[in-house]
Amino acid sequence: MRRLRRAKIVATLGPASSSAEMIARLFEAGADVFRINMSHTSQERMRELVGMIRTVERDTSRPIGVLIDLQGPKLRLGTFTGGAVMVKTGDSFVLDSDPAPGDATRAYLPQPEIFVTIKPGHTLLIDDGKVRLTVSEAEPKRIVTRVVIGGKLSDRKGVSLPDTTIPFSALADKDRSDLEAALQVGIDWVALSFIQRPEDIAEAKKITRGRAAVMAKIEKPQAVHRLAEIIDLADALMVARGDLGVEMPLEKVPGVQKQMTRAGRVAGKPVVVATQMLESMINSPVPTRAEVSDVATAIFEGADAVMLSAESAAGNYPMQAVATMNRIAEEVEGDALYRNIIAAQRAAPEATGADAIADAARQIADTLDLAAVICWTSSGSTALRVARERPRSPIVALSPNISTGRRLAVVWGVHCVVTEDAHDQDDMVERACRIAVRESFAKPGQRVIVVAGVPLGTPGATNMLRIAYIGADAAKN
């Protein structure tokens, strides 16, 4: 199955999309990667969903990516007498280490790390920013605040600290357990929630040890400030606009989205734009015009993928949401302005032989209007380099590793085919031509460009480029 677009679609699975039949329908509608949110999914259910995805993969003979989204260290209040209280603007409110139920003057804050790092003047946001507090005094077991925006506080509501870097791991005990379970069933991507620093990525990579790629969810101001360092260590980025819009002013989120999309492309790392992209389609079969524009803007900016959350997980129209996103992407990419924007954003290649080869492949393919750029890749690095250049020609990645194909499912423009490794350079070119014809990317009489690393099978050794003419024999296999 060949997609008629370059941007990829990530669809979240949930109650509305947890059957094998629905997963197959979502894939047919356009989903390239399936996300499993471990905040709402048990390990047993996660294993079942991965099994269903792999069944669809076998039935369609197409690599499908599986993304596990870890819950992360969510900060929460304790409980309240009666379950809820009202706090008024201007009142004093205390957060302390006493586990007794709270009232209109105080509440239990169970994370001791907060008390030693928060400072006067810092902000606390409760229940996604509905209640805002400013710190007046900070003591080892007690924080005195002033209520800036009052409202209702109830049991175990979430707490956000946009000004405070908290000295704890991005992997809670639940996350470590979920990650190990996910690695055992062969997931492809793991998304880390609420990261603050590059060390959070390094910690996760010590656990994954190459068994899964690591995606950094940028949803805290602290992570935005250290974006360059995080990009260096992460394998991909997610613009997690939900919590990001809680912890920083909403009007700043679009600029951060553009900054991340641009930085990811320069680094050759995939970028996924997420949260509320087609939110109204939870209850409506058609999106709002603003939502269509939001998805289109992300694609115009050059995002590798756009993501559906509740729309596909818990909405009434999951298949329609995926199909709508698919149509928007196809329409945007057919616009002449899209190609102009993509070309204008192209950065100079890194000063390496592999990056020079990828840049040359793009220039040759564009100049000669070649049918496809075909990459032989073991680790996926060759395909990533070519995708960074955003050629007009389709990118076909050939890999002997199914795990590589699955990880590349989130990368802009890459259509991956799993095939045995080439025996020599002649076999490499001949098989590339046959597969390009078989997958409907080329016809006899057209030309393709083949990019690879020699010796064959050496990860990251992109050093060969060859223009190949497709003969009539290529259509016979």
What are these regions (language model features)?
Residues 1-477:
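Non-catalytic helical/linker scaffolds that mediate oligomerization, partner binding
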